[in-house]
Amino acid sequence: MYIKDNTLVDDDNVTHRIGDCCIFIMDDNYKSNIAGCIADIGFCNNCISVEEVNSSGQLTLLFTEHIKVIGRLED
């Protein structure tokens, strides 16, 4: 699963369009930078929080439907 060009592609290679979302992570610089990148591409219309951002740039997101999505922010 990965995130690219304002879409999320899941493990079955299904593409999901991503809408607007504000994500704020008041933590270390790395997480803040990742959050800024997510905000810049308008990531995820119904995401309510980022559960984790690890050193490899992998994101765990919690959606309003209580589904956790793990993806990677790619260029």
Where are these regions (language model features)?
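Basic/aromatic-rich interaction segments and small domains that mediate binding to polyanionic partners
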Residues: 21-64
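Mixed-charge, Lys/Arg-rich low-complexity intrinsically disordered regions
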Residues: 1-18
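Surface-exposed charge patches in extracellular/virion surface proteins
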Residues: 17, 30-31, 68, 72
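Intrinsically disordered, low-complexity, charged/polar segments
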Residues: 2-6, 53-75
